[in-house]
Amino acid sequence: HSEGTFSNDYSKYLEDRKAQDFVRWLMNNKRSGAAE
């Protein structure tokens, strides 16, 4: 059970990381688009 909980928490952590990267990517795109 502890293994399942760990992998579940880890997948949640990865999802958060992906979300943050996506937001950063969006911000960069908006910035470069506005600069153009």
From Swiss-Prot:
<comment type="similarity">
    <text>Belongs to the glucagon family.</text>
</comment>
<comment type="function">
    <text>Promotes hydrolysis of glycogen and lipids, and raises the blood sugar level.</text>
</comment>
<dbReference type="InterPro" id="IPR000532">
    <property type="entry name" value="Glucagon_GIP_secretin_VIP"/>
</dbReference>
<dbReference type="GO" id="GO:0005179">
    <property type="term" value="F:hormone activity"/>
</dbReference>
<dbReference type="GO" id="GO:0031769">
    <property type="term" value="F:glucagon receptor binding"/>
</dbReference>
<protein>
    <recommendedName>
        <fullName>Glucagon-1</fullName>
    </recommendedName>
</protein>
<dbReference type="InterPro" id="IPR015550">
    <property type="entry name" value="Glucagon"/>
</dbReference>
<dbReference type="GO" id="GO:0042594">
    <property type="term" value="P:response to starvation"/>
</dbReference>
<keyword id="KW-0372">Hormone</keyword>
<keyword id="KW-0964">Secreted</keyword>
<dbReference type="Pfam" id="PF00123">
    <property type="entry name" value="Hormone_2"/>
</dbReference>
<dbReference type="GO" id="GO:0005576">
    <property type="term" value="C:extracellular region"/>
</dbReference>
